[in-house]
Amino acid sequence: LHLCDRRQRQMCIRDRDNLTYESESEYGVIEISLDSVVELQKTSDEHYIYMDFLTPHEVYDKVVVIDAGHGGNAPGATKQGINEKDIDLAIVLKVKELFDEAGDESVGVYYTRTDDSNPSLEQRVDMANKAGADLFISVHNNSTKSGRMSSINGTAVMYDEEKASEENGSMQLAQICLEEMTAALGSTSKGIVKGHEIYIIRTAEMPVALIEVGFMTNQDELNRLNDEAYQKEAAQAIYNAIYRAFQEGY
């Protein structure tokens, strides 16, 4: 968090431990490192800047965390010089554009990464858990086990089968995502797939869906996945799935 205000001669911040930082200069930068997901509410008067840290649900009716798979030195599937991590991120950034453009102040959306970084699996799921997210969506792309080019193609969505009996749970969310993705992309449905062994699925405390948009080991699908227009269609489908889930009671 960086907070700059040229108008204030004195700046003061107090956290829960009553830690105080003050600066008498005309310009200051306050940098705060937090171990949880919070929203900043800032007010000021002639002398002070006051900051309150609120939980996401104190600000928003609904909270979503969206994860772009892999990143950094973990490229994911790689074919013909195309890295899965880049496609995952491109789609998620286009989802972000849709939420930013909509400006829906009732929904708070957080992203595990918006650049070529590689948060640990623990950091990714911790963000969702600490934010008290209502939904956790992770975006990936698939490949065959051998990694060889193949005719196998299509969209699959993974869910937590250990929580399959829950109403409005992971399995139902996965089905919503699958239906929206295949309808928008015209891709083959590979169904919803059990994924409890996947760390972020197993440890998420809310309904989670891990979307495998397509197969990078299929030439036609690889070409589409690397196409910006197709990425926009995938992003729109994810956006639609999130709002559909809310409409269905999540």
Regions found by a protein language model. Name each.
Residues L1, Y27-Y60:
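Surface-exposed edge beta-strands and adjoining flexible/disordered loops or tails in beta-rich
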Residues D45-E179, A183, S187, N223, ...:
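Catalytic-core regions of hydrolytic enzymes
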Residues N141, K145, S189-Y250:
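Active-site-adjacent mobile loop/cap segments within catalytic or ligand-binding domains
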